[in-house]
Amino acid sequence: VLAGGGHTHALLLQMWLMQPRLRPAHTLVTLVSRHSTALYSGTVPALVAGLLERSACGIDLWRLCGLAGVTFVRSEITGLDSQARELHLEGRPPLRFDRLSLDVGAVTAETGAGSAASGAGAQPVKPLEPFLDWLARPSPGAVVRIRGGGAAAVELALALKARGFVPRLLLRGEGLQLGSAAANRLGEWLLAEAAIGLERRAAASAAADLACTGSRAPRWLAAAGLPVDGATGRVLTDASLQVRDYSGVFAAGDCGLIAAAPRPASGVWAVRAAPVLAANLQRSIEQPEAPLRPWRPQRWALQLLGDGGWRPGGPRAVAFWGPLALGPSHWLWRWKAGIDRRFLERFANQASMAPAAMACRGCAAKLSAGPLEGALARLEGAAVCQVPAQGPAADSVAAPPPVVAPTPEDAAVVATAADGALLLQSVDGFPALVADPWLNARLTTLHACSDLWASGASVESVQALVTLPEAEPALQEELLLQTLSGVRSVLDPLGARLIGGHTLEGRDGAGLALGLTVNGRAAPGRHWPKGPLHPGDVLMLCGPLGSGVLFAAAMAGAARPEWIDAALERMQRSQAPLVELLAAYGCRACTDITGFGLLGHLGEMLGAGGPGLGSGALERQGFQEVDAGHEGGTEVACAWAAVAGAADARPVCTGRSAGAGAAGDGGAMRPLVVTLDTAAIGALPGALELLEQGWASTLAPANGRALALLQGPIHLVSAGRPTALKALLIDPQTCGPLLAALPAERAGSALAAVHRAGFAEAALIGRVQEGPWPLPIRPA
């Protein structure tokens, strides 16, 4: 387990990617970080000054881990049990390890007495992410008081000057603390040139806005019993980076300190520690009896500080090396900027090493609609053909019930309880969408439960089928624990139970996969089928689309980490609260948008039993009508089936509705038309951009057959980006949103209630009407 996404660990992964022989053989490696982007500290002052964008200052840990074959776990580390060899994480079970490497960075050593404005403590500069969020609050021209007098405080003050603030430094002593007399003199000259005031011997109670007072390691390291430096809390190691008296535990970067050669926290030493850490992790696993490689870091590290470019002529920099100080000059800035750029390019250029197009996972790994429905149609036909004739009385023998339901529903009704409630069951599952087994199980469970929520049911129990990769028994135990804990993380808040299951060991390199059988109950009168839709119904989509294309691009290293973070945050939101809300506002048909995309699942709703796609509509669209022989029947069941002689599959009406037509229509039913407002259909961040670039899930081409509906019962009111929006309509979803049909007069109130419940991205996207012409979307 690599705890933390610091510079040493990032370089370690890059080394493993470029030189796989350096990676310990037959080892599952997991990296844990609170953020999916590791900010490179050397570029942060330029970011504060406005010289760089935030996207240019980070290392994409999602992509780096994926390319290096490392499991990425995004979580806050809360503690360490060194005896049980477990790393404790926030809100999820601990991770057990055989080897542990600590590179968790540092936090600001102290925060001062408080802000003059609010009385709250000064904002620490470390961790960097909360500080950068704070940076957006003050208005340009505001006075920003910074407690601190080291190199970081000086560079930050100059960057804030360039940003338009009025910084002041609060010094604990009489002067700066830049490591040498020459550096202190040059630092004071830079600050005086920028008219940045110094408050010498500032009282500890003096109000400050920012704290930049040095760093110390997170306190949970000392709480775990590890040996630490008393002043900084950094974990004490020997020359091999192994923690003193703790075999198999290593520490590097700002949280580690070689006891025999202490050096201040600096990115220079963090970078140079990476080859040593790589060698010793490999040696400790593959050659546990061999001595570890020692390292003695250089005595001094070059420091290059930028002035933020506050004055005309462009940014400058100064250089400190031991007792020497040089600058300021523009060429020193160009040198510094080049060093930083080349460091980050080592990681950005790894995108070219992404594998060629790979089959998508999650719900995009499901079978496409064509072969699925073809097999079911043949199964039904085979069952009918196998009914034996019984002589002259055979004509009077009742036909057997259908092998499969004529209209596929999200969940099957298996029984009716004594109180009239319906007992429902559904099954779902797929190969792991993400490498983190706990998160993958959580996503799979939410995805499976949505079939019951779309049917108006609550979830009561689940059984699991877990396929584990071939591995050592202890590792399989850990993977199974993490998987079942992820399932429980969804079920426990619902009051549902994991009542059983089965395990398999995969063969031929098969990875982790999870399937779930989900059981639930729908209150009397609440069961929602997929249809029929009724004229006047308004369609509510309860969330954004785009997970398919995002994870397809992520597999190739083309999705930005913040896009994946946003998608996973949305996908982990339980839709259970929507059941009561939609019921209260008269929901009468519902489905969840999953593998076949919005168009495919809306097509199922249109084809569901009742006056959905009337025969007249089908004939005008060139679809084949089949008389199922139910004379006088009032139910029309339309399903996707193969049309004889056609290369593709089209909707086929398998029944006829009698007496439902309007006057002058010859008794034929009027067709239903759905008008979709594409401007109202939400997209996850990054989804439309990727679709415009040509990215698509591997299931999307098969889903493309649903685009034929746009030539028939579904009309689009298009906004801009028509190509991307059409592609979004067939994008397969994992943990996709519910799509509900509501009475027009209650749809607006229902939407407001859904927004209040936390589903801010829900929208009214369509309206159902009779007739072939596009109609207004939103109810009056």
Give the positions of each predicted feature.
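Helix-biased detector of long, well-ordered alpha-helical tracts
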Residues: M353-A780
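A conserved FAD-binding loop/helix module that cradles the flavin
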Residues: C255-I285, A290-G308
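C-terminal auxiliary extensions adjacent to catalytic cores
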Residues: G309-A354
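A Rossmann-like FAD-binding core segment of flavoenzymes
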Residues: F72-L80, L95, A162-A239
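FAD-site-proximal beta/loop scaffold in flavoenzymes
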Residues: S118-G141, A206-R272
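Residue-level recognition of short, solvent-exposed, well-ordered loop/turn junctions
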Residues: R96, S139, R272, W528, ...
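Beta1-alpha1 glycine-rich phosphate/pyrophosphate-binding loop at the start
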Residues: V1-T71, A116, I146, A151-A181
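FAD-binding core/adjacent interface of flavoenzyme oxidoreductases
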Residues: L67-R147, L210
